[in-house]
Amino acid sequence: MKFTIKKEILLDALVKVSKAISTKNLIPVLAGIKFELKKKKLTLTASDNDITIQTTIESLNDEDFKIENEGSIIIQGKYILDIVRKLPDEYINVEVVDELKIFIYTDKSEFNLNGISESEYPNIGLE
């Protein structure tokens, strides 16, 4: 999975879905946000098993949101939100390497996170 997106677009989506994440959840994978990138769309999903919030960002032009490779992964919600919020740059690159390693970078900064396989995320039945 690899894409480049305007910071404000990604941050807006992360803020929306992160409202469903509980810090007291007994299921560790639910502390994450599921990123699904396919068919020119990025879908973010977060849930605490009671409330689920999902939002979709469409790639209408390559200037605001450019998709290079499709894929899906779960990224810890608190970490990704804090990183994106603090980045000073206008564009953010997100790349998954070696299946579960997430590389988030801009012109001036770079971060490495460990992801969780999307197969571990519970099926919440939204479509």
Listing of model-derived features with the role each one plays in the protein:
Residues M1-E127:
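Structural preference for solvent-exposed beta-strand-turn elements
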